Amino acid sequence: MDERSLTFHIGPVWFDGTVCMMVLLTCLIVFFLVYFFTRNLKMKPTGKQNALEWVIDFTRGIVTDNLPRKELNNFHLLAFTLFLFVFVANNIGLITKIVLPSETTLWKSPTADPFVTLTLAFIMITLTHLFGVKKLGFKGYFVNSFLKPYSFMFPMKLIEEFTNLLTLALRLYGNIYAGEVLLTLIANMMNNLGWFSLPLAIPLEMVWIAFSLFIGSIQAFVFVTLSMVYMSHKIEVEE
């Protein structure tokens, strides 16, 4: 796809304006969703409160499945916020497609950009190291993370840190980007073939949107789950 993004710079540093705008919009959507779903809370939840409590229980399950139960309060809010952000970021690009005549894209999923997913993965991997140092002290963290069970595995453990970062980021990026590419190809087919393509293109577009929504949800789950798995490797002492 020959698409370009809005760009701007602050001094010598250039930024992708489309991505910055979509990341900000994603944050606002998450904030207002939580605000809307938490208004007028009741002891007997109904409707929107049930939906929010289901997401809360779902993310609690991710944490307790991968970390000791005593760590639930420390990481549940992180998992909940991360899941909502990645879920919205994955699926926001399915709402519409805005491209200017100059081929400048104004609307897309932020996680369809590799720099966004690499940044998210870098933040999560960095947090695992910080929490490991906080809980075990620097010496305990270093020994637990890189020298156990055998010290000769240190080079492999070091390489593993980089592969964890890359796989966490590129898995998310690849799935979301591929979905948006195919949606764009279907839309281009409709544009090029005209009305004759509608009986085939519209059902195909609807099916692929539904499939992309499913994939986006699964990838949000996978991203949070792997983040908690990597966290457990850093804060749990290996025997």
Curated annotation (Swiss-Prot):
- Asked if the record carries the keyword S-adenosyl-L-methionine, the reply is no
Q: Where are the transmembrane segments?
A: 17-37, 75-95, 113-133, 182-202, 206-226
CDD domains according to UniProt: ATP-synt_Fo_a_6 (cd00310)
State a single Gene Ontology molecular function: proton-transporting ATP synthase activity, rotational mechanism
> How does this polypeptide assemble, per the annotation?
F-type ATPases have 2 components, CF(1) - the catalytic core - and CF(0) - the membrane proton channel. CF(1) has five subunits: alpha(3), beta(3), gamma(1), delta(1), epsilon(1). CF(0) has three main subunits: a(1), b(2) and c(9-12). The alpha and beta chains form an alternating ring which encloses part of the gamma chain. CF(1) is attached to CF(0) by a central stalk formed by the gamma and epsilon chains, while a peripheral stalk is formed by the delta and b chains.
Annotated function: Key component of the proton channel; it plays a direct role in the translocation of protons across the membrane.
Q: Which family does it belong to?
A: Belongs to the ATPase A chain family.
Kindly provide the name given to this protein in its UniProt entry.
ATP synthase subunit a
Lineage of the organism? Bacteria, Bacillati, Bacillota, Bacilli, Lactobacillales
Q: Which gene encodes it?
A: atpB
